[in-house]
Amino acid sequence: MESTLKEMRDGASVLDMDPKSTVGGGVEDVYGEDRATEDQLVTPWTISVASGYTLLRDPHHNKGLAFTEKERDAHYLRGLLPPTTISQQLQEKKLMNTIRQYQLPLQKYTAMMELEERNERLFYKLLIDNVEELLPVVYTPTVGEACQKYGSIFKRPQGLYISLKEKGKVLDVLKNWPQKSIQVIVVTDGERILGLGDLGCQGIGIPVGKLSLYTALGGVRPSACLPVTIDVGTNNEQLLKDEFYIGLRQRRATGQEYSELLHEFMTAVKQNYGEKVLIQFEDFANHNAFDLLAKYGTTHLVFNDDIQGTAAVVLAGLISALKLLGGSLADHTFLFLGAGEAGTGIAELIALEMSRRSKTPLEETRKKIWLTDSKGLIVSSRKESLQHFKKPWAHEHEPVKGLLEVVKAIKPIVLIGTSGVGKTFTKEVIEAMASFNEKPLILALSNPTSQSECTAQEAYTWTKGKAIFASGSPFDPVEYEGKVFVPGQSNNAYIFPGLGLGLVISGAIRVHDDMLLAAAEALAGQIKEEYLAKGLIYPPLSNIRKISVQIAANVAAKAYELGLATRLPRPENLVKHAESCMYSPAYRYYR
């Protein structure tokens, strides 16, 4: 040991040292790793050819026991795998049996994430073939719990972490990502994760989960997806004190420091990947969400799922519900509990659709839509104190405080909850809705399940089976007086994967409101009479890939119509083109 330290002090390289001084009768230490002391640098050598041991640990190419005899010979896998060869279908069956044995959703989530880290195609095969069962596992509501506990369950990095430490070097950080042909980026700053608040850097679970759905449901290649978290600190005291927290331990940066980092990121993305890369803003706080969309909507291909995606999926549900309610959107009155990014985004898209259909000015159609916030009904007498995104919804009416009083005063046929506060649709509120509506439409959209404004059981029971109900998080079927009601799920997963695919295949350079309307109309067009007969206003998620194809084709058509598409010439059949562009998780055969 003394001789080793002497050689180090004399400036000798690790590779120049006598192997016998530190390695006792073992394999020769070619790279000097065993001879290096803890404070000495070594080179992290890797084998670049995907074969043998390396191939089995490459999630993009690993097939586990599904490697054929020929592949095992060609890629030096003999002896590295048990002798049996099984199909991808049998692998899927085995893993689903294992996952179903777990009692806790978080255990299932962890199992799925571990599968993605070792066999990417099998992960997507499971998710696509079992979408209704696994969607709540890899995304809402389970992903919320995963983000809360991310520091404890963190094993290996997923996605790209850009913190204030990287300010001035963001372009270099983007270049560290191994995949170069990126088409979709989902980025969060972790300030408003679902209905759970500020989770800081641990919000990375949301972009990771979202992009897995872009692939599974929308067919965007996994290698073309990039999850990003912008870490500017957190105001969550619990996380700041948590020894396992993985992010910056400081209060959240705001103002110029925040906007400069975001601007550097947006500029670097365009510089590195071009202007046809879709950037989806995810779970930003209200003030930043609206500002970012307004600031970059004219210069980048940007989309906010909380504002625009939620709006499109709710609008699709309302268009479907008209077949049960009768009339047009303009014939009905809408009331929102919650006037944040989701509430105002939905309201604006409903008003826009009304305006397009009825050829009425937007200012007029907005008057059919009422919003309430924590201070009560948004009315014109409050206009001076309102945030800018609430002002278009301040109508002439006397101030009304409580939700029950608002419902009785406005008498809406549609009640939409986007408050992020659970149990706010009380028995009295729901009963009031049923008292003046033959079929009250109740949408409890807040996530996760614990934050839902009411449950499906409550909606059906309190309206005596009259309600048309849909929620943001899934609920089990409800039996009331001998009849089984199947609650719909107003899940953004119906819209954003198909929208993303449509933007990618058309080479769109901007997201236009008419594309959102096109996506909503395509989704509403997939609802059949048999679904409506059960009170469903959304089609089954089991058909989501086919639905995404229709949405993608509609969105792409609108991009070409608006002159925003760059992939020319336009394909003759956009539906077939969308299908042909979708990623398939089936195993490839290797030479």
From Swiss-Prot:
Catalytic center residues: Y139, K210
Gene3D superfamilies associated with the record: Malic enzyme, N-terminal domain, NAD(P)-binding Rossmann-like Domain
GO biological process, one term: malate metabolic process
KW Oxidoreductase (keyword) present: yes
InterPro entries: Aminoacid_DH-like_N_sf (IPR046346), Malic_enzyme_CS (IPR015884), Malic_N_dom (IPR012301), Malic_N_dom_sf (IPR037062), Malic_NAD-bd (IPR012302), Malic_OxRdtase (IPR001891), NAD(P)-bd_dom_sf (IPR036291)
Catalyses which reaction(s): (S)-malate + NADP(+) = pyruvate + CO2 + NADPH; oxaloacetate + H(+) = pyruvate + CO2
Tissues where this protein is expressed: mRNA found twofold higher in leaves and stems than in roots.
Subcellular location: Cytoplasm
Keywords, alphabetical: Cytoplasm, Metal-binding, NADP, Oxidoreductase
Biased composition regions of type Basic and acidic residues, renumbered to the chain: 1-10
UniProt cross-references to Pfam families, sorted A to Z: malic, Malic_M
Region described as Disordered: 1-26
Domain of life: Eukaryota
Residue numbers binding a divalent metal cation: E282, D283, D306
SMART domains xref list: malic, Malic_M
Family: Belongs to the malic enzymes family.
Subunit structure: Homotetramer.
Protein name: NADP-dependent malic enzyme
Lineage, opening ranks: Eukaryota, Viridiplantae, Streptophyta, Embryophyta, Tracheophyta
